[in-house]
Amino acid sequence: QLGRHSVPAVACGINYAPEDIAQAVDTWHVDSVAFDMVMMISDPAVIKGGEFQVFQGTKQEGQSLLGIRGEEGRDSELPAERVTTVAFPGAGYGFLQQGNMIFHRACRLLEKVERVTLIPSFEVLPASSRDATNSINMLEWTDPGLEAELARREIWRAAARLNALLDSISIADDRGTLHRLIGDALEPLNSLRASLKEPRS
């Protein structure tokens, strides 16, 4: 089950083409959220360039070909036979993608024109479920209040996992099992807490 993302900075974003059309609209990258939608707001019939493309392979393979890692982007070319262009039939059309797994980009514009996309993001529910949002990566963003919102999110989801653990823990569980279960419930929150000690790079 998916629901609106609990972090306001990513719950719904708007992407604009850069003023300098020599720059890519968005370089090859993966997203910090597990699921998002890409919806074209502008009329694609009047846009030259700016194509949305996906790499036909794993994100690790695409990153290796470009010499990058993590979620950083790079404005380079991948083998054309490994790249698919996703067409938008008109304004208002879009698609849902597993953004943290699909290596994708939006190409440079060939002519200066408005190109606007709406990007709603989602997370897996209930809150006790596994969700691949990369809160650690998002700590590097500069949105006002984002660090507190990420902390709230991880506290909320950790509390949900602990509540689920209350119902599932067994009197037969040994020390090792209990240690693992508690650690699993707290790991994302503890990772964020540790990252908050480090200055933004």
Regions found by a protein language model. Give the residues of each.
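Short, Lys/Arg-enriched charge-dense amphipathic segments
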Residues: A24-V38, A127-N134, K197-R200
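Catalytic core of Fe(II)/2-oxoglutarate
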Residues: G50-A160
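Conserved double-stranded beta-helix
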Residues: Q1-G50
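Intrinsically disordered terminal extensions flanking catalytic oxygenase cores
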Residues: D131-S201
